[in-house]
Amino acid sequence: MDPILVLVFTLSCLFLLSLWRQSSERGKLPPGPTPLPIIGNILQINVKDICQSFTNLSKVYGPVYTLYLGRKPTVVLHGYEAVKEALVDHGEEFAGRGRLPVFDKATNGMGIIFSKGNVWKNTRRFSLTTLRNLGMGKRSIEDRVQEEARCLVEELRKTNGSPCDPTFILGCAPCNVICSIIFQDRFDYKDRDFLNLMEKLNEITKIMSTPWLQVCNTFPVLLDYCPGSHNKVFKNYACIKNFLLEKIKEHEESLDVTIPRDFIDYFLINGGQENGNYPLKNRLEHLAITVTDLFSAGTETTSTTLRYALLLLLKYPHVTAKVQEEIEHVIGKHRRPCMQDRSHMPYTDAMIHEVQRFIDLVPNSLPHEVTCDIKFRNYFIPKGTNVITSLSSVLRDSKEFPNPEKFDPGHFLDENGKFKKSDYFMPFSTGKRICAGEGLARMELFLFLTSILQNFNLKPLVHPKDIDVTPMLIGLASVPPAFQLCFIPS
C-alpha cells in the first residue's frame, strides 16, 4: 500500500478517535464550546485578556462550563455562587492543585503552593503551625512589620523628594519581613544581592503574565523543545532556590535543636517527621522549595499591591486626602501606626480593600483540581479534572459592587461611613487553598501604606487625569504599568 495513503489513513483515524473521546467526555462534563482536536478551544480565548474571554463564554454556557485547553478538559467556575459552592461547600473535593506546567516543572510537585495530596496537607499544616509559633497573628509579628515600616520610611526619605520608581523599594519591605521569618535576617535596601533577588522575582511575575506563558501552560511540550522566556523563569527560580539552599546549609551547621530561631530551624528539627516519605536529600529539596514558595508569595503579591495602591492614590488625590485626614485624626504625626488603629479608620480600611478588589491581582487564582469523582450542579466532574475559578468575576460583580470598573472606596462603606465587609471580597481566594499568608499581607498593607501617607505627600509627574492605571499585562497576575513619583516629606 502507498505509504502516503497509510499516513493519511492513520491521521484520519487519530483525528476521529480524538473527536470521539472529546465527545464522550463532553457528555458528562458541564456544557461548553465544541473543541478542535489537539488545540481544543484555544482559538476562542484571547490570551491577552483571558478574564474577558471567560466572561463572554459564561454568558453563553452559564456559570459552570467546560473548556478544552489543548486536549485536557478544564471546568471554569464564574461568579460568586459557583466559586463559593465549589471551594467552600465542597472544599475537600476541590482542594487539589491543578496543573500549571511551568511551575510543576520548576517545583517537581514539592513545596506548599504546587504540591498535592498528603504532601500538600502535611506541608501546609506544618507551615501554618510554625508560622503561628513564630508570631503570625500575634504582637511579635506586628512589631517586625512596624520596624520594617520605619525602615521603609527612612529609605523613602533618602529620595529627597526626587522622582523615583518605587518598584524595588516597595518590594524590599515585605521581602525583609518574610526573610526575618524564614531565616531570621533582613537586608539593607541597597544590598546588591537583595536587589538582584527582587529583580528576579519581579521578572518571573511579568513573564508568567505574558501570552506566551499562557500558551506554554496549555501546550507543555513547548517547555522542553522551544526557546523562549519560559527558560528565564526556570533560571530565575533556580537562582532564588539556590540562594535559599545556601541559607539552609548555614542553618544546618549552626542548628541548636533546643532553640529554633526561624522557619528553617523548625523544619530541620520537626519537618522531617511531617515529610517522612522523602529521603534526606529530597527533604532538603522540599524545604528549599517550600521556603521559595513562602519567599515568593510573601514578597511579590504584597509589593505589587503596594505599587498599584500608590498609582491609584496618585490618580485619585481626593481619596489620598481623605486617608491622610483620617491618619491625622486617629494616629497623628508622631506615633507609629498599629493594627488597633484599623478599626478606628474605616475609610483607610475601605481604601485598601478597594485597591485589592479593583486591581484584581490574580484574576483566575491558581488552578484547582478535583480530588475525586464529584457530581456538581448535576454535572459529573471526574477525578483529576482541572478547575479554574474566576476571582475576577466575583470581585467585579456589579450587584455587589455597583460600577465595578470604577475605583471607589465607597464599595466597602455603609450609609453611615462605617466599614462594610463583603463575602465577595476574595483576592486571596477562599476555601482550603486560601493563601496561608493572608493575615500577614493584610497587616503589611495597612501598616506600610499608613506609614507612607503619614510621612509623605505623593506627587505625580503628570496630571492625575493623564495617569493610566490599566494593567501592563493580565495573565497569571495583573501587572501595573511602570511609573515614577515623588515622596514629598509632609
From Swiss-Prot:
Keywords: Acetylation, Endoplasmic reticulum, Heme, Iron, Membrane, Metal-binding, Microsome, Monooxygenase, Oxidoreductase, Phosphoprotein. Its EC number is 1.14.14.1. GO terms for biological process: arachidonate metabolic process; linoleic acid metabolic process. The modification N6-acetyllysine is found at residues 249, 375. Pfam families: p450. It is a peripheral membrane protein. Its cofactor is heme. It is found in: Endoplasmic reticulum membrane; Microsome membrane. CDD domains: CYP2C-like. This is Cytochrome P450 2C50. The gene is Cyp2c50.
